[in-house]
Structures are given as structure tokens and as C-alpha cells.
Amino acid sequence: LNLKMSIKELFNGDDEPMNIDGIDSKNGLINIIFNEDGIANYDIALKDEKTIDDGKSSPLSLKIQNYKVENFKLRYFDESSKIKMVIDSLNHEGTGDFTAQKLDLVTKSTAKVSLDMDKVNYMKNVALTLDAILGIDLEKSKYTFKENKALINQLPLEFDGFIQMVEAGQEYDLKFKTPTSSFKNFLGVIPSAYAANLDNVKTTGDFTVVGFAKGLYSDTTVPKFNIDIVSNNASFKYPDLPKSVQNIVIDTRIINETGILNDTYVSLDNLSFKIDQDVFNAKANIRNITQNAIVDAALKGTINLANLSKAYPIKL
């Protein structure tokens, strides 16, 4: 942990804030574990200890100009819900006046995220980028998205709404969407190891992601949410490959209407595409996703691996 400040700040009066030019930390590791009783590994304070307030101390006032963390790693595991999350290669920096009760915090963040739920992998080293101005109300513990730009791998997203810390957990009221409707957005969400360079890929058609999350995140609940993923009559062609993928239709919804995680369901109303004369169609519904998933699917069509390798840059 590095601290940058003028030596004269050590001699400020009791009513003067201590001006800190910057705080930074590198190569840190945070390991958080909740056992089956919901007790965290950092909860080590003695419950029966009582502190005596003599009324003589005053809170320390800090005026921090900027802070930065580089190459941090966060591991989270909940033994009861079997949720495991790893945030790796976390780089984050922010600037703002932390002496104010309300401030605009200018932030830049990058990370790679992996997520497993009950031994099922949902995300693996997904690259996240977020440049955002957050309106912070320290008195209400409320964080509001103002100007922001996010990338999931190469999929752009914009957020609107707020997150607020409350006694029972965190209250969410967020909306998000893709700022543009290009089908290249869909290729952008695929990990770069499987999608290759997108700079010269020719695409037609649209692709949009629109959704919201609203409600309480706590030990027993998640915010209710709805995510619509839609594409109509799209196509793409990589410049170094002879074939293209055409007539792409995607109509998918990921929905939670109760706030109970296991009630989340996926409705794939339509997935279809064509490579040469090979046409593929699929429909599916997936429920009970965090326990013993129930899948109802109908698949019809032809997938010729030789044609697929001529249209999509992946070794089969």
C-alpha cells in the first residue's frame, strides 16, 4: 500500500481535513468465504465486546484526490449456495472529493471474471471494462450511474439507475442496453479466443440486448430481472474464410419474476441460421437452473462441420 501526501499535512489542526494526493496498491489478493451458516471468514470480532465512548475523539477527515488498485484478485465462495466467483487482473482507479457527502466519482475499471454456480460454469475469464461517473451519496450509501461506457468482452453496454446499500443487503434499480444495434455486438460477447479479430468482419442485421434488474440482493434473494436478446435476419463473414453465416435469428429471454435465484428461467423462442444450404433451427426452455436443470428443447437441421470451419474461425 502506497500513500502520497505532503509532509505538512501531518501537522493540520483537528478541524482540517488531511489532503492525500493518492493511494495505490498492487498485486493484492482478497479471499472471501461464507460457510453453510452464512458466516464469513472475515467476521472475527468478539460479539460480547463493548466499547466505551468517552466523547473526546473526533472522526478523521481525509481529502483523497485519487486512488488506484493494480492487478488485484478477488475470490468469493459461498458454501451454502455453491456460488464461486473469481475476479482476476482487476485494475481500478478513481478520482473525487471524499470529504463531501455527495460527490461525482470518475472511475476506470478492467477485470476478468469467472462464475460457477453449483459446479456449473457460467462465465470463464470474461473481460470486463467500465468507464463511469458515479454519483455518490455517502449519507444514503447510494451509487447512481451517470455517464458510463461498459464492455463485456467487446459487447458495449450502457447503464442507467442506482445501487444502494441497505441493512438487509443491496437495493438495485438498474436498466441496461446496447448503445448500437450492429450484429457485430453479438460476436463481441464471444471470448476473443473463439471469435478472432472482429475489425474486418462484415456483418448485416441487428443485435440488441435490453434488460433491467430491480429489487433486493440479500442472503436469500436476488433482484428480479429480465434480459431480452434479439437479432433479426443477420449475417457475418470473416475476410479470410470462404463462407458466411446467414439468416441468423435470435429471440431469447432470461427472466426472474420472484427474486428467488432458482426460479430464473431461459426462454429460447428461436435460434436459426444458415451456412450454404445447411439450415439449423432450435427452441428451448430451461428452468430450475441452479439445481437440477430441466431442459425442454427441440432441434432441427443440419450442421456440417466442414462448412462450419469455413465460416467461423475455430479449430474443430
Model-derived features with residue positions:
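Transmembrane beta-strands of outer-membrane beta-barrel proteins
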Residues: 108, 146-148, 160, 175-177, ...
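Sequence/structural signature of outer-membrane beta-barrel proteins
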Residues: 76, 114-116, 234-237
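Extended hydrophobic secondary-structure segments that form protein cores and membrane-embedded regions
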Residues: 21-25, 67, 226-231, 269-271
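Transmembrane beta-strand segments that form the barrel wall of outer-membrane beta-barrel proteins
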Residues: 142-149, 266-271
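Outer-membrane beta-barrel proteins
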Residues: 7-12, 213-218, 256-259
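Amphipathic hydrophobic-ligand
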Residues: 1-5, 80-93, 121-131, 149-161, ...
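Secondary-structure transition motifs
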Residues: 1-100, 159, 163-167, 171-196, ...
